[in-house]
Regions:
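Acidic, glycine/proline-rich low-complexity segments that act as flexible tails and inter-domain linkers
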Residues: 1-38, 49-51, 55-58, 65-66, ...
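Short, structured motif recognition centered on aromatic/hydrophobic residues
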Residues: 40-47, 77-78, 156-164, 195
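Alpha-helical oligomerization segments
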Residues: 187-215
Length: 215
């Protein structure tokens, strides 16, 4: 079990709360069916959703780096999440990453579009029947990021599932991202652990997500 970053600081804030927080931290980091990178991405994604970009983000960045998550992977996670959590919060998040000493971005290449396939293509096709303009916007956003290097499709889908749980988008968005995760190797056990891990950021939301996923 990894040492939780920031534990001593929490004790200084409130010793009883620190014990409670350590318990939920060990719950997440002890889950067997998520990789250490994925556990870090759960935390870093939830930080954008609420948002809490002060001490919690600092603790989660430290935990990610101490578990061999590359700084550029943290950046890529946040690039990926922009259309899901909203571009404006990412401006503040990248400012905070700079303040926390994360190295400057290594990737400055022009963003390329990769044609969508499979579940993503079907989602855009279905959306076009509702609103063609929105479908075109969504297609561009998806084509810009799902095939980029630095994160696997499974990692990207898991991060999007965290957003779905936090924002309670438990219909077609949740189903799409669960299908993408499964197509990239995730199992029901993976999804169960994900929902259990996200419970740290809002228990009742995880209850609803578990029911929506049929877990």
């Amino acid at each position: 079990m990894p040492q939780l970053a920031g534990a001593e600081a929490l004790v200084r804030l409130d010793p009883v709360f620190a014990q409670l927080a350590a318990g939920v931290g060990h719950n997440l980091w002890g889950l067997a069916h998520l990789t250490m990178r994925e556990k870090a991405f759960v935390c870093l994604t939830a930080d954008l959703c609420h948002p809490h970009l002060d001490v919690p983000l600092a603790m989660h960045v430290q935990m990610a780096l101490s578990n061999q998550v590359e700084p550029e992977a943290i950046r890529e996670l946040y690039r990926h999440l922009a259309p899901y959590v909203g571009y404006p919060i990412l401006v503040t998040a990248f400012q905070r990453l700079a303040e926390l000493g994360l190295p400057e971005a290594r990737d400055d290449k022009p963003v390329e579009l990769t044609p969508l396939r499979g579940e993503l293509a079907r989602a855009v096709h279905d959306l076009a029947a509702v609103d063609q303009g929105l479908a075109e916007f969504s297609e561009e956003q998806l084509a810009q990021r799902w095939a980029r290097p630095g994160l696997s499709v499974r990692e990207r889908a898991i991060a999007c599932l965290v957003v779905d749980v936090c924002y309670q988008t438990l219909g077609e968005s949740l189903r799409l991202h669960a299908a993408l995760a499964r197509s990239a190797g995730a199992t029901d056990d993976t999804l169960r652990d994900l929902v259990r891990g996200v419970a740290e950021f809002g228990m009742a939301r995880s209850w609803a997500a578990a029911r929506a996923l049929g877990l």
